[in-house]
A protein has these predicted regions:
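Charge-rich, low-complexity N-terminal segments
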Residues: 1-100
Length: 100
């Protein structure tokens, strides 16, 4: 199972606020049914890598449908094959090492 961090940034918008575009991107991801976590700087998605990459393409296209003329999308993929990984597992591992 892959864990992916994706950030979709609309460029050249009328105002510095991009939350309306982020909401549109989040809606696409919610409709996919993939497990994910929205953060202040991006979205973490876990699941089958092919399914994730397919929905990322749709997420990237969403701001264009809202009139944006340029979009920058950054993707970081953690595709571990020796054992099943998860968002919670990564956080739990660090917290255990911190003694939390």
């Amino acid at each position: 199972m892959a864990v992916v961090l994706v950030t979709v940034v609309p460029l050249g918008t009328a105002t510095p606020s991009v939350s309306q575009y982020v909401a549109g991107v989040e809606r696409v991801l919610r409709d996919s049914g993939l497990k994910h976590e929205l953060t202040g700087m991006g979205t973490i998605i876990e699941g089958d890598l092919d399914a994730i990459l397919s929905v990322i393409r749709k997420m990237h296209e969403q701001p264009f449908s809202q009139g944006v003329l340029r979009v920058s999308t950054s993707i970081r993929i953690d595709d571990r094959r020796d054992k099943k990984g998860s968002i919670e597992g990564k956080i739990r591992s660090v917290r255990e090492k911190l003694g939390d």
